[in-house]
C-alpha cells in the first residue's frame, strides 16, 4: 500500500578506507553533501528531484535486493573494500533500503551518476 505525501528520502553513503561520501535530501529543497571531510548544504531544484525519481523507476532500483552480495560469502571478508548504503522513499511512500560490500546491483553506476546530477556531487 502506498501512502500519499510521505516525507521523501534520498540518502546514499559509500566508503572504503577514506571518510564516507554521503548525499542526503533535507527539507525545503535542500541537500547535504559530505565528501573529503567537507560538509556542504546546497539548494536543490524541484525538477531535478522529479527527474531523479523518474530515473530510479527506469533503472529498476525498486526491484534491487536488500543486501549485496545476496549470498553470504564462504570466507570471512576483509574490511578494506567498498561498503555502501542506499535509502529511498518517494513522495508516494514507495521505499527501498539496500546495502552492500564489494558487490553491486545492475545499473548501480548509473544510479550513482543520477545522484551526482541531482546533488552536484562527485561520488565515484
Labelled PLM ranges:
Residues 15-21:
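Short, thiol/selenol-centered motifs that function as redox-active sites or metal-ligating centers
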Amino acid at each position: 500500500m502506498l501512502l500519499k505525501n510521505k516525507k521523501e528520502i534520498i540518502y546514499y553513503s559509500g566508503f572504503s578506507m577514506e571518510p564516507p561520501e554521503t548525499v542526503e535530501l533535507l527539507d525545503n529543497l535542500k541537500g547535504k553533501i559530505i565528501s573529503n571531510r567537507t560538509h556542504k548544504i546546497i539548494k536543490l531544484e524541484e525538477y531535478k528531484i522529479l527527474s531523479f525519481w523518474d530515473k530510479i523507476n527506469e533503472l529498476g532500483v525498486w526491484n534491487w535486493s536488500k543486501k549485496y552480495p545476496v549470498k553470504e560469502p564462504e570466507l570471512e571478508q576483509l574490511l578494506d573494500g567498498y561498503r555502501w548504503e542506499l535509502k529511498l522513499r518517494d513522495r508516494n511512500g514507495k521505499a527501498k533500503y539496500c546495502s552492500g560490500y564489494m558487490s553491486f546491483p545492475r545499473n548501480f553506476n548509473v544510479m550513482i551518476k543520477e545522484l551526482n546530477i541531482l546533488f552536484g556531487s562527485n561520488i565515484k
